[in-house]
Amino acid sequence: MMDLVAYTPRRPKSGETLRGDSFSIALGGKGFNQAIAAGRAGAQSSMLGNLGTDGFGDDFMKAFVAEGVNSSDIERSAELGTGVGHISVQTTDGDNSIIIIPQSNDLGDAQYISRHSKTIIESDILLLQLELPTSGNLAAAKLAKENAVTVVLTPAPVAALVGWEGLVDVVVPNEGEAAELTGIEGDVTKQAEALTKLLGCKNV
Protein backbone atom coordinates (compact mmCIF):
# COMPACT_ATOMS: atom_id res chain seq x y z
CA MET A 1 0.00 0.00 0.00
CA MET A 2 1.25 3.46 -0.87
CA ASP A 3 0.29 5.77 1.99
CA LEU A 4 -1.20 9.13 1.00
CA VAL A 5 -1.24 11.08 4.24
CA ALA A 6 -3.11 14.32 4.93
CA TYR A 7 -2.35 16.16 8.18
CA THR A 8 -5.19 18.32 9.45
CA PRO A 9 -6.26 19.96 12.75
CA ARG A 10 -9.46 17.90 12.71
CA ARG A 11 -11.46 15.63 10.46
CA PRO A 12 -13.84 17.39 8.07
CA LYS A 13 -17.57 17.12 8.62
CA SER A 14 -19.74 15.57 5.94
CA GLY A 15 -19.75 17.85 2.88
CA GLU A 16 -17.08 20.13 4.34
CA THR A 17 -13.87 21.17 2.58
CA LEU A 18 -11.13 21.65 5.15
CA ARG A 19 -7.72 23.24 4.70
CA GLY A 20 -5.01 20.83 5.84
CA ASP A 21 -1.57 21.47 7.30
CA SER A 22 0.59 19.20 5.13
CA PHE A 23 0.66 16.14 2.90
CA SER A 24 3.06 13.25 2.38
CA ILE A 25 3.41 10.14 0.25
CA ALA A 26 5.19 7.17 1.80
CA LEU A 27 5.70 3.49 1.18
CA GLY A 28 3.45 1.65 3.58
CA GLY A 29 0.93 -1.07 4.15
CA LYS A 30 1.14 -3.45 7.08
CA GLY A 31 2.76 -6.21 5.05
CA PHE A 32 5.48 -3.95 3.68
CA ASN A 33 6.21 -2.43 7.08
CA GLN A 34 6.48 -5.87 8.69
CA ALA A 35 8.75 -7.21 5.94
CA ILE A 36 11.09 -4.23 6.23
CA ALA A 37 11.11 -4.35 10.05
CA ALA A 38 11.88 -8.07 10.04
CA GLY A 39 14.75 -7.53 7.63
CA ARG A 40 16.19 -4.70 9.69
CA ALA A 41 15.97 -6.89 12.78
CA GLY A 42 18.24 -9.41 11.09
CA ALA A 43 15.75 -11.89 9.63
CA GLN A 44 15.88 -13.20 6.08
CA SER A 45 12.67 -11.50 5.01
CA SER A 46 10.56 -12.27 1.94
CA MET A 47 7.51 -10.35 0.72
CA LEU A 48 4.54 -11.98 -0.98
CA GLY A 49 1.92 -9.86 -2.69
CA ASN A 50 0.86 -7.97 -5.77
CA LEU A 51 1.73 -4.55 -7.18
CA GLY A 52 0.71 -2.57 -10.22
CA THR A 53 3.10 -1.85 -13.07
CA ASP A 54 2.78 1.83 -12.15
CA GLY A 55 5.23 4.23 -10.57
CA PHE A 56 4.12 3.32 -7.05
CA GLY A 57 4.89 -0.31 -7.79
CA ASP A 58 8.33 0.65 -9.08
CA ASP A 59 8.99 2.54 -5.84
CA PHE A 60 8.19 -0.54 -3.78
CA MET A 61 10.44 -2.80 -5.85
CA LYS A 62 13.34 -0.36 -5.44
CA ALA A 63 12.74 -0.29 -1.68
CA PHE A 64 12.85 -4.08 -1.41
CA VAL A 65 16.21 -4.11 -3.18
CA ALA A 66 17.56 -1.33 -0.97
CA GLU A 67 16.40 -3.09 2.21
CA GLY A 68 17.55 -6.56 1.20
CA VAL A 69 14.03 -8.03 1.25
CA ASN A 70 13.40 -10.90 -1.17
CA SER A 71 10.71 -9.74 -3.62
CA SER A 72 10.91 -12.60 -6.14
CA ASP A 73 7.38 -13.77 -5.27
CA ILE A 74 5.74 -10.42 -6.01
CA GLU A 75 3.52 -10.39 -9.09
CA ARG A 76 2.69 -7.18 -10.96
CA SER A 77 -0.50 -6.28 -12.78
CA ALA A 78 -0.95 -3.97 -15.75
CA GLU A 79 -4.73 -3.90 -15.20
CA LEU A 80 -4.87 -3.07 -11.48
CA GLY A 81 -2.75 -0.39 -9.87
CA THR A 82 -0.73 -0.59 -6.68
CA GLY A 83 -2.91 -0.45 -3.58
CA VAL A 84 -3.16 2.85 -1.76
CA GLY A 85 -4.13 3.95 1.73
CA HIS A 86 -5.72 7.37 2.26
CA ILE A 87 -4.77 8.45 5.77
CA SER A 88 -6.08 11.44 7.70
CA VAL A 89 -4.01 12.44 10.74
CA GLN A 90 -5.20 15.00 13.29
CA THR A 91 -2.23 17.19 14.15
CA THR A 92 -3.72 18.07 17.54
CA ASP A 93 -3.48 14.55 18.99
CA GLY A 94 -2.14 12.22 16.30
CA ASP A 95 -5.43 10.37 16.00
CA ASN A 96 -5.88 8.91 12.53
CA SER A 97 -8.35 7.21 10.24
CA ILE A 98 -7.53 5.20 7.13
CA ILE A 99 -9.31 4.25 3.91
CA ILE A 100 -7.60 1.53 1.87
CA ILE A 101 -8.13 0.94 -1.85
CA PRO A 102 -6.69 -2.55 -2.44
CA GLN A 103 -6.51 -2.63 -6.26
CA SER A 104 -3.80 -5.21 -7.13
CA ASN A 105 -3.75 -6.44 -3.53
CA ASP A 106 -7.01 -8.23 -4.33
CA LEU A 107 -5.07 -10.56 -6.63
CA GLY A 108 -3.45 -12.24 -3.61
CA ASP A 109 -5.97 -15.09 -3.54
CA ALA A 110 -5.62 -18.83 -2.90
CA GLN A 111 -4.36 -19.41 -6.44
CA TYR A 112 -1.60 -16.87 -5.89
CA ILE A 113 -0.59 -18.60 -2.65
CA SER A 114 -0.49 -21.95 -4.46
CA ARG A 115 1.97 -20.53 -7.00
CA HIS A 116 4.26 -19.30 -4.23
CA SER A 117 3.81 -22.03 -1.63
CA LYS A 118 7.52 -22.91 -1.54
CA THR A 119 8.43 -19.62 0.12
CA ILE A 120 5.90 -20.17 2.91
CA ILE A 121 6.86 -23.81 3.48
CA GLU A 122 10.54 -22.91 3.81
CA SER A 123 9.90 -20.07 6.30
CA ASP A 124 9.99 -20.11 10.10
CA ILE A 125 7.37 -17.39 10.60
CA LEU A 126 4.49 -16.18 8.42
CA LEU A 127 3.20 -12.65 9.07
CA LEU A 128 -0.34 -12.03 7.83
CA GLN A 129 -2.75 -9.09 7.87
CA LEU A 130 -6.22 -8.56 6.44
CA GLU A 131 -5.43 -6.21 3.55
CA LEU A 132 -5.41 -9.29 1.29
CA PRO A 133 -8.33 -11.49 0.15
CA THR A 134 -9.59 -13.91 2.79
CA SER A 135 -9.08 -16.89 0.48
CA GLY A 136 -5.40 -16.07 0.11
CA ASN A 137 -4.86 -15.44 3.80
CA LEU A 138 -6.56 -18.66 4.86
CA ALA A 139 -4.71 -20.69 2.23
CA ALA A 140 -1.41 -19.24 3.45
CA ALA A 141 -2.26 -19.89 7.11
CA LYS A 142 -3.33 -23.48 6.45
CA LEU A 143 -0.18 -24.15 4.43
CA ALA A 144 1.93 -22.70 7.22
CA LYS A 145 0.27 -24.79 9.93
CA GLU A 146 0.67 -27.96 7.86
CA ASN A 147 4.40 -27.27 7.68
CA ALA A 148 5.04 -26.15 11.29
CA VAL A 149 5.48 -22.49 10.33
CA THR A 150 4.48 -20.03 13.09
CA VAL A 151 1.55 -17.81 12.03
CA VAL A 152 1.32 -14.23 13.33
CA LEU A 153 -1.88 -12.36 12.43
CA THR A 154 -2.45 -8.61 12.52
CA PRO A 155 -6.28 -8.45 12.26
CA ALA A 156 -6.50 -5.19 10.34
CA PRO A 157 -8.47 -3.86 8.67
CA VAL A 158 -10.96 -5.56 10.97
CA ALA A 159 -13.06 -8.29 9.40
CA ALA A 160 -14.97 -11.30 10.70
CA LEU A 161 -12.41 -13.98 11.57
CA VAL A 162 -14.45 -16.86 10.18
CA GLY A 163 -12.40 -19.94 9.38
CA TRP A 164 -9.30 -18.85 11.32
CA GLU A 165 -9.73 -21.07 14.38
CA GLY A 166 -6.65 -23.18 15.01
CA LEU A 167 -4.60 -21.45 12.30
CA VAL A 168 -3.04 -18.60 14.33
CA ASP A 169 -0.22 -18.82 16.86
CA VAL A 170 0.01 -15.11 17.72
CA VAL A 171 -2.58 -12.36 17.13
CA VAL A 172 -1.51 -8.71 17.47
CA PRO A 173 -4.47 -6.30 17.38
CA ASN A 174 -4.41 -2.72 18.58
CA GLU A 175 -6.93 -1.59 21.21
CA GLY A 176 -9.56 -0.52 18.69
CA GLU A 177 -9.29 -3.74 16.69
CA ALA A 178 -9.49 -5.87 19.83
CA ALA A 179 -12.63 -4.04 20.95
CA GLU A 180 -14.31 -4.38 17.56
CA LEU A 181 -13.47 -8.07 17.23
CA THR A 182 -14.63 -9.03 20.72
CA GLY A 183 -17.33 -6.46 21.49
CA ILE A 184 -15.49 -5.71 24.75
CA GLU A 185 -14.49 -2.13 25.51
CA GLY A 186 -11.61 -1.06 27.73
CA ASP A 187 -10.65 -4.36 29.39
CA VAL A 188 -7.59 -5.69 27.56
CA THR A 189 -7.43 -8.84 29.70
CA LYS A 190 -10.97 -9.85 28.76
CA GLN A 191 -10.30 -8.90 25.15
CA ALA A 192 -7.25 -11.18 25.11
CA GLU A 193 -9.21 -14.03 26.66
CA ALA A 194 -11.98 -13.62 24.09
CA LEU A 195 -9.51 -13.59 21.19
CA THR A 196 -7.77 -16.75 22.40
CA LYS A 197 -11.14 -18.51 22.43
CA LEU A 198 -12.14 -17.08 19.05
CA LEU A 199 -8.93 -18.10 17.30
CA GLY A 200 -7.77 -21.02 19.42
CA CYS A 201 -4.39 -19.36 19.94
CA LYS A 202 -2.40 -18.86 23.13
CA ASN A 203 -0.68 -15.55 22.44
CA VAL A 204 -2.29 -12.11 22.13
Predicted regions and their residues:
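Conserved phosphate-binding/catalytic loop of the ribokinase/pfkB sugar-kinase fold
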Residues: S72, R76-S77, I87-I125
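Glycine-rich phosphate/adenosyl-contacting loop at the front of the ribokinase-like
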Residues: M1-N50, G55-V69
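Conserved phosphate/ATP/ADP-binding segment of small-molecule kinases
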Residues: L138-V204
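Short beta-strand scaffold segments in enzyme catalytic cores
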Residues: I36, V84-S88, S97, V204
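Beta-strand->loop->alpha-helix junctions that form or flank phosphate-binding loops
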Residues: S22, L48-T53, S71-T82, T154-A156, ...
